[in-house]
Amino acid sequence: MNWTGLYTLLSGVNRHSTAIGRVWLSVIFIFRIMVLVVAAESVWGDEKSSFICNTLQPGCNSVCYDQFFPISHVRLWSLQLILVSTPALLVAMHVAHQQHIEKKMLRLEGHGDPLHLEEVKRHKVHISGTLWWAYVISVVFRLLFEAVFMYVFYLLYPGYAMVRLVKCDVYPCPNTVDCFVSRPTEKTVFTVFMLAASGICIILNVAEVVYLIIRACARRAQRRSNPPSRKGSGFGHRLSPEYKQNEINKLLSEQDGSLKDILRRSPGTGAGLAEKSDRCSAC
């Protein structure tokens, strides 16, 4: 399986994540995907061919293997990692939408050159407003997917340990036959390791949700105690009504200053311009 596309996607979202989110991504790729690709797939590569039963009845090996291993461990973990990583698409789409709106605002303001547009693409979007909700929802879905897959894994393989010998009496086996599992100890070690990594990811997801809620409450309390500063040039600042009003006031003040310069330079026409200025002020 090629994980390059998934890595590229999550790396892009990682730029806008919290510190806990970056740790989660490291656990996903170092302790889960790398182990799955490098070691686990080779360990489970012969699981079907090396599952041997002490009978020559055609089809007995296949039905016994399907009874005790309905879903391969590797395929189940691969599906789990894909679904756990999918909620990051929600954050990626939201960030792309915000950057698209900001680029449109820059073009309307006359700053649509490639340098400014590339700067918008590179700068980090702060987790606030609707992005905060999108990020929290994505983390909650990651948490739910992890918990559901661990429960499904427990239902399929109770105890999480790989047995050495299983007894099978499913048709078309002539009687109760003994079937032997290849590399049971090695598979048990990898199973425990992958489940432990999944448990660590669950803890990180819970910690990230708590951290985001606490930080949002702290920001709200700070805004209530101290009025928000109007300085800065972030995305929210560019689209806020205060920013737009400040820009309008700046343009009006520049026009007023230009009018005063004209009055100083042309005393003869100063009275007429002053009268027009007074009429405009009265309006």
UniProtKB/Swiss-Prot annotation:
| PROSITE patterns (UniProt xref) | CONNEXINS_1 (PS00407), CONNEXINS_2 (PS00408)
Q: Where does this protein reside within or beyond the cell? A: Cell membrane; Cell junction, Gap junction
Residues assigned to the Cytoplasmic compartment are 1-22, 96-130, 215-283
First-listed, main subcellular location of the protein, grouped into a coarse class: membrane
Q: Which SMART domains match?
A: CNX, Connexin_CCC
Gene Ontology CC: connexin complex
Q: Which residues carry this modification: Phosphoserine?
A: S233, S258, S266, S277
Transmembrane domains' residue ranges:
23-45, 76-95, 131-153, 192-214
Superkingdom, taxonomy of origin: Eukaryota
Q: Which UniProt keywords apply?
A: Cell junction, Cell membrane, Gap junction, Membrane, Phosphoprotein, Transmembrane, Transmembrane helix
Q: From the Swiss-Prot or TrEMBL record, what is one GO molecular function term?
A: gap junction channel activity
Q: What membrane topology term does the record carry?
A: Multi-pass membrane protein
Tell me which InterPro entries the record gives.
Connexin, Connexin32, Connexin_CCC, Connexin_CS, Connexin_N, Connexin_N_sf
Q: Which residues lie on this side of the membrane: Extracellular?
A: 46-75, 154-191
A single GO BP: cell-cell signaling
The subunit field of the Swiss-Prot or TrEMBL record says: A connexon is composed of a hexamer of connexins. Interacts with CNST.
Q: Which family does it belong to?
A: Belongs to the connexin family. Beta-type (group I) subfamily.
Q: What does this protein do?
A: One gap junction consists of a cluster of closely packed pairs of transmembrane channels, the connexons, through which materials of low MW diffuse from one cell to a neighboring cell.
Name of the protein this chain belongs to: Gap junction beta-1 protein
